[in-house]
């Protein structure tokens, strides 16, 4: 299943170098998707998601010293003891949302903006909440530099959602509470989907939440995962 991601032998990396690494990342995501096809219910992710992953320059959304490793399929350290998610998990979470070009999306946990950029490629508008001010500022700068004008970021605790812009077609959460915050379910439109990691630190699951036309809510565990805890949502 493993597809090796070549790293440069030395010297300054160029855009063509990053492009080659990005294509290797895409191949590894495809291989891992096939490997967990039973859990995902599919062996191939939506081509629109894969195209977005192939387009967005992940090296522009990681710390400068980690750029050579931007396309390795692994989480990377970010600011303030946070991490940027593994590309495979980014792709799976995005695919589970089944985004449409007309969708408005609520993202909890902007980080440095990589997942936000993927969402912005596929949806009409992204409303993203980041609790750490410096990370929110950096994300705004990075997203603006790459022309993403369909994103609004606010600084705050994402557990309460963003009522002023609710309801949302889709919700994605990039840090894990022990339980799904009720406001995020309330702010999901009928027919909407939410993807969220949840559970105790050593027992987290990636969960797909669906709300039907009558507001009935169902959940499905997808994969075991390990995420940073959602701020102000520690266990207990």
From Swiss-Prot:
One of its GO terms (cellular component) is cytoplasm. The active site is at residue 85. It comes from the Bacteria. The keyword Methyltransferase applies. One of its GO terms (molecular function) is protein-L-isoaspartate (D-aspartate) O-methyltransferase activity. Disulfide bonds: none annotated. Signal peptide: none annotated. HAMAP family: PIMT. Catalyzes the methyl esterification of L-isoaspartyl residues in peptides and proteins that result from spontaneous decomposition of normal L-aspartyl and L-asparaginyl residues. It plays a role in the repair and/or degradation of damaged proteins. This is Protein-L-isoaspartate O-methyltransferase 1.
């Amino acid at each position: 299943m493993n597809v090796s991601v070549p790293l440069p032998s030395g010297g300054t990396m160029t855009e063509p170098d990053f492009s080659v690494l990005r294509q290797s990342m895409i191949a590894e995501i495809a291989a891992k998707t096939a490997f967990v096809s039973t859990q995902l219910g599919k062996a191939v992710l939506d081509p629109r998601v894969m195209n977005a992953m192939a387009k967005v320059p992940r090296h522009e959304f990681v710390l400068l010293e980690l750029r050579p490793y931007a396309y390795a399929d692994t989480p990377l350290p970010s600011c303030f003891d946070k991490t940027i998610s593994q590309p495979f998990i980014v792709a799976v979470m995005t695919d589970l949302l089944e985004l449409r070009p007309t969708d408005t999306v609520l993202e909890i946990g902007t980080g440095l903006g990589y997942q936000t950029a993927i969402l912005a490629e596929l949806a009409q508008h992204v409303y993203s909440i980041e609790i750490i001010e410096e990370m929110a500022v950096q994300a705004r700068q990075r997203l603006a530099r790459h022309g993403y004008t369909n994103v609004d970021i606010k600084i705050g605790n994402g557990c309460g959602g963003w009522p002023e812009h609710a309801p949302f077609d889709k919700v994605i959460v990039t840090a894990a509470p022990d339980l799904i915050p009720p406001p995020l379910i309330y702010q999901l439109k009928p027919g909407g989907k939410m993807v969220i990691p949840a559970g105790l630190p050593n027992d987290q699951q990636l969960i797909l939440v669906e709300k039907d036309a009558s507001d009935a809510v169902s959940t499905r565990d997808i994969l075991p995962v390990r995420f940073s805890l959602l701020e102000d949502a520690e266990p207990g």
